[in-house]
Structure formats: C-alpha cells, structure tokens
Swiss-Prot record:
Highest classification ranks of the organism: Eukaryota, Sar, Alveolata, Ciliophora, Intramacronucleata
Binding-site list for AMP: A215, K216, K220, G239, G313, E344
Name used for this protein in its record: Phosphoglycerate kinase
Pathway connected to this protein: Carbohydrate degradation; glycolysis; pyruvate from D-glyceraldehyde 3-phosphate: step 2/5
Chain positions recorded as (2R)-3-phosphoglycerate binding sites: V24, D25, F26, N27, R40, S63, H64, G66, R67, L122, R123, H170, R171
The species this protein was found in: Tetrahymena thermophila
Length: 420
C-alpha cells in the first residue's frame, strides 16, 4: 500500500501555472520568538524547491505549531517560521494571519505569480482537529457543518495538493484528509519515509532485527505482536524488559519498572515468538542505580543475583551489550524504536550508545537501519550519528503506528498511482 501512492515526481507536468497547496510539518520549537531547531523546515525544502522549479502559479504552505487546542494562541503563531524559511529558500515568503476564510481566499487569489504564502497555524481552528478545549477546560467536538466549510475553504486555496507532513500522517485531521483535489501527492520527505518503511515491512533483506525499548509492555503490545509477524530477531530492552524477566525467570527486580497489565500477556507474546521462530533477546545483566538522578550510586547485577530492593535497572550490562552487538552484526535490516536505558543520564546511556555504534558499523557494511520514536531519534542526534544510519524518521507517532501495522489516514488519502 505504502509504495502505490503518487509523489511529486509523478505530477511535475501538472504543476505549471497551477497553485499548489502543500501540507508541511513546521511544528518547530521556538525560543524568544525565533526558531530554535529548523530540522523540520529543512526537511521540506527539497519538495518546495522542486515545486517552484515547475513554475507554479503559486505555492501555499500550511502547518500546525504546538497545541493551541482550537484557540488562537499567539505564542503558537507560525509567523516566526517566516524568516527561517526565507533564509533556507533564498526568497521572500508572504505570511497570512489566518488559514481559511474570505480574506485568506482573496489574498491567495490576488497573489502575484510564483508567490510563496505561509498560512497561520491550522490548529487555531477547532475544525482542523475536529475538537477544541473551551474556556472551562472541557474537550468539545467541532461542529460538523463548520468542519465541512473549513475543508472547503482550504481546498479553494490550491488546484492540487501535496502532503509532506509525515509527523501528522497518523492523524485524520482536515488538512490531512479533507483537501478535495484529484491530485493528492506525497512530498519528498513523506515519500522517503514511506519508501523506507514499506521496504522494511513488506520486503526486508533478512535477517530482519527489531530493537524495542520503552517503559511499559502494555504500550508496546500491538507493536510487539505486529513485529513478531515480520522479523527474525527481536531485542527487548529498556524499562519494559524487567516485566519480561520477572515473568520468565521469576527474579527479583527491585524498584525497576514493572507493568502489571503487561505481565499478564508476556506468555502469549513469547508463545507467538516461538510459533513464528523469532529469537528474542532480553538483558542478562544490568547496570542499576539507587535513584534516577545523575548523582545516583551504581551497582551491577545479573539474572542469577536478581536486583535487590532499593535498586533500579537503568541500563544494559556488558554481557547484554555483547549479545545485542552479535544480533546487530547478523542483521541486514534493523528497525530501532526505544532506547535501552535511561539515556538522558550519561552513566545510564552506555548500553544505548554502544548499540548505536554497532548499528552504525553494520549500516556501513550494507545493512538498512531505520530509527524511529522521539527518544531514539534524540539519542542519534546527541551522538551525532544521523548520517551513520540509513534513515531517521521524522514522525514518532506516525512511525510507531506504521510498525504496529496500522493504516495512516494521511497516507491512505493520497492518490494511487493507477488513479492519476
């Protein structure tokens, strides 16, 4: 499904003298009214430049920023994005202080040829997400008639639609699934995400290894279930490993994370792994702390000793690291979602950093490596390893839902190649 959707290269001949409406993900962090990290803006620059090369009548960009919950909140305005976007494109960008309505429609219609317009935050309107939070703090559903009008107004701002916002592809929001044009194409950033994930999930080079981390088993049940249908080996680390270890080996886990709900389903997951012939790797030794803080005292324990009361499992030990490295060395496709320990604290980051080093080495030897999920992406950026892996996903929630086997509304809505 993922590879059947049209991209910018399929629609180049349709762009000249047409106005392109493009959904981007410019949800960037701001500091004192300036863009703090432009990575997401940079991500869509190739798509924007390619569209501009085709001499469109104009290009209208729309995005959300932050969580204004359907209200106009000035600190979430898109306006600070303009100078950074102008700098990256080397050309002027016009900012409109709304995203729908008569004034916006008029301004777009009367804009000069080839003009780039950035609309105000889509989420200032309840109709974008289909809900808002009122003055009393209650969640309220948006009026369905108003949602239709909102979508109609957005649609009128272009002749064809390009979506480059992978980060919100798992949301059935108006700007993702409500723009009613025959041509609905993926931008380069979105297409790159889909190409990497479709290859890994539909036709991976084997052995296929998935590395999972995170705190709670119950949050990852669907992910584990889905990946057991696809992979050859699975590393389970991070906080959720202790729930597995307690169930399998009945060891003491001290004050380590324990997920009671997830505990009940461990047997079921292990049975499926056995039936599917998937080799599961769990920690065999651990670095523990007497607190979560940077100044925590540390001690090492293993499966034989268990973890005494007062100690928390916070990272993989050397034997576990060696076993994980061997699994990585065998793999030709690696998908990694979730760090192996409390990587925010340097002394508990070693297991994750070591694993990343081996993933980078294996990538340099020809394996495909995909990094997804906010924490793992942060780790890769901290270690300056972005260029050492095949692909760092820009969408935490979207990549997780893809791996869980879910259909992403924003992707499903794109035009199929055979419909063009």
């Amino acid at each position: 499904m993922l590879s059947r959707k049209i991209g910018i290269d399929h629609i180049l001949k349709h762009i000249e003298n047409k106005r392109v409406l493009m959904r981007v993900d410019f949800n960037v962090p701001l500091k004192e009214g300036k863009v703090k990290d432009p990575t997401r803006i940079q991500g869509s620059v190739p798509s924007i430049k390619k569209i501009l090369e085709q001499n469109p009548k104009g290009l209208v960009l729309m995005s959300h920023l932050g969580r204004p919950d359907g209200n106009r909140v000035e600190k979430h305005s898109m306006k600070p994005v303009v100078p950074k976007l102008e700098e990256l494109l080397g050309t002027k960008v016009t900012f409109l202080n709304d995203c729908v309505g008569k004034d916006v429609e008029e301004a777009v219609k009367s804009s000069r040829n080839g003009e780039i317009i950035l609309l105000e935050n889509l989420r200032f309107h309840p109709e974008e997400e289909g809900k808002y939070i009122d003055a009393a703090g209650n969640k309220v559903k948006a009026d369905s008639k108003a949602v239709k009008e909102f979508r109609k107004s957005l649609t009128s701002l272009g002749d064809l639609f390009v979506n480059d916002a992978f980060g919100t592809a798992h949301r059935a929001h108006s700007s993702m699934v409500g723009v009613d044009h025959k041509i609905r194409a993926a931008g380069y950033l979105l297409k790159r995400e889909l190409d990497y994930f479709s290859k890994a999930l539909e036709s991976p080079n084997r052995p296929f290894l998935v590395v999972l981390g995170g705190a709670k088993v119950k949050d990852k049940i669907q992910l584990i279930e889905s990946m057991l249908d696809k992979v050859d080996e699975m590393i389970i680390g991070g906080g959720m490993a202790f729930t597995f270890l307690k169930k399998i080996h009945n060891i003491e886990i001290g004050n380590s994370l324990f997920d009671e709900e997830g505990y009940k389903i461990v047997d079921q997951l292990l049975e499926k792994a056995k039936a599917k012939n998937v080799k599961i790797h769990l920690p065999v030794d651990f670095l523990c702390g007497d607190s979560l803080e940077a100044n925590a005292n540390t001690r090492s324990f293993d499966l034989k000793s268990g973890i005494p009361a007062g100690w928390i499992g916070l990272d993989a030990g050397p034997k576990t690291m060696a076993e994980n490295a061997e699994a990585v060395a065998r793999a030709n496709t690696i998908v990694w979602n979730g760090p192996q320990g409390r990587f925010e604290v340097d002394k508990f980051k070693v297991g994750s950093s070591d694993l990343l080093k081996h993933v980078a080495t294996r990538t340099s030897q020809g394996a495909t490596s995909i990094i997804g999920g906010g924490d793992t992406v942060n780790l890769v950026q901290q270690e300056k390893a972005t260029q050492k892996v095949s692909h760092v996903s820009t969408g935490g929630g979207a990549s997780l839902e893809l791996l869980e086997g879910k259909v992403l509304p924003g992707v499903a809505y794109l035009t199929d190649i055979d419909q063009l």
